[in-house]
């Protein structure tokens, strides 16, 4: 499953390296360690991380839960570092960033519609959007990293995939713990809101 997912990316995302002012021999030496899986993986992980980072950036002004805001802040910092390392690896490969997934909603990627909904939400609705979207992002990211480790060749790429996978597993664990501690309906109480003239009265049973 993991290898197949990355293999599909290879078909549509492989790009030819550009040499610029570098001699053909030097360029070939620099890029020979990177195979199609390496570059396809990097070209997908960059926009995935960018979208997730955009979502976490909304948390300080929209989250109602300090724990969710803290989780988003930590995730955002990690994503920024991941992006720095991914862009460095892409530069090392010699493959240009052609943005093959620009505007796409790939599996696990935070969708443009999700970003719009998150930007319009506040409080608990925002927290739910953020935690659901981050869970999907982390899960897909970990799967793609496993595929890269199995099928990639360049040490720079496979090593980065291993590091991101390890970090993502920790974030999934932290997110799941947070979600489990905050069920939609706490305890066994159920609150019903009933209209009462111009006012509303909440009853708990």
Please provide the spans of the model-predicted regions.
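Sec-dependent N-terminal signal peptides
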Residues: 1-6
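C-terminal motif of bacterial Sec signal peptides marking the signal peptidase cleavage site
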Residues: 9-12
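All-alpha RGS (Regulator of G-protein Signaling) helical domain and cognate RGS-like helical scaffolds
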Residues: 14-205
